[in-house]
Amino acid sequence: MSGQEVRIGVLANQGDENCMKLWGATAKYLNEKIKDHKFFIVPLGFDEINQSVESGDVDFALVNPSIYVELEMKYDVSRLITLKSQVSGKELIRFGGVIFTSSTNTTINTLEDIKNKSFVAVDAESFGGWQTEWKEFLDHGIDPYKEFAKLDFAGTQEQTVYKVLSGEYDAGATRTGILEQLAQEGKIKLSDIKILNQCTSCNFPFLHSTQIYPEWPIARLSHVDDRLAHEVALAMMEMKPVDEAAKNANIAGWTVPQNYTVIGNTLKTLKIRPFENYGEISIKDIII
C-alpha cells in the first residue's frame, strides 16, 4: 500500500463536524509520522459503518466496541490498538453509560421510576449511549422496549442530553464523560443533572450507571498489509497527551489492544447483532 491514500473510518457519534474536530489532527499526526502514505479521516454514521467496511472503502476503523465485535465476526477485521481517554490527569482505557434525568424531575429517582415514562438514547447501535444502559435495565428486571411509554434515539450524545434537560423526555442515556465534557464547555451545569443508579464502587472518575467496558479500538481491515498496520500501531502508541492529535480528541493516547470478550457477552445478553439468534436452536442444528 506504499504511497496510497489510507482512509480511517471513524464512528461519528457526535456528528460529522465534531468528528473532524476530534480526529482531523490524528490524520495530520500520522501523515507526519508515516510520510509515504496520505491519511484521511472519514466520518461514518451508525448506518454507514458496515457498508464502508464490506466494500473496502476504508482501511482502518475507529468504532465503539459493539460495532467492532460485529465487524470482527462478519468481515474479519482485527483490533490493532485501544484508546486511552483522559480526565483530570488520569488515563483510562474503559468507559460505560450514564442514565440520567433533570434534577428538577421529582418523579424519577430510580430505574424503576422510568417505567411508563419517555426515554431518549443516542442510537440503537451506540454502545455507551444505549446498549450498556439497556443491559443495566434488563439486569434490574426492566424491559425498556416493553415498559417505557416511549423510547426514541436522538442521533448524537449532545442532543440526547439537551432533550432531557429541555423536558422533551423524562430521562435519557449517554456515554460516560459526555456530561462532564458539556459542563466543561459551559453548555450545561452538572447541578441540573440527576444521575440514576449511580455507581461508586469501582475506581472510575466519571459519573456512570453501568458496568465499565474496554474503550474504543482501532481495527485494521483484512486487506491492510502487516507492515502498514505495524507502522500505524507504533506511531499511535507513541502519541503523547500533549500532542495536538491527543488534545483535540481529548484523549491521553493509545495502548495495546484490550480483550473485548465482555462486549460479546453483553451483546449475547441483548440478543443483538451479531448475536441476534444466540441461544436459539435451528432445524439445521437438529439435523446436524
Question: What residue ranges belong to the model's regions?
Answer:
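Short helix-initiation/N-cap motifs at beta->coil->alpha
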Residues: 40-54, 64, 84, 144-162, ...
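An extracytoplasmic/periplasmic, membrane-proximal ligand-sensing/linker region
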Residues: 9, 14-25, 209, 224-288
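Periplasmic-binding protein-like
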Residues: 7, 11-12, 81-98, 188-233, ...
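Extracytoplasmic small-molecule ligand-binding "clamshell" domains
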Residues: 1-70
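Short, Asp-centered acidic motifs that coordinate Mg2+ and/or phosphate
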Residues: 59-60, 79, 170-171
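Bilobed "Venus flytrap"/periplasmic-binding protein-like clamshell domains
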Residues: 3, 7-31, 89-162, 177
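Hydrophobic residues within well-ordered alpha-helices
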Residues: 53-54, 114, 164-165, 232
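Pocket-lining segment of extracytoplasmic ligand-binding domains
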Residues: 118-120, 124-224
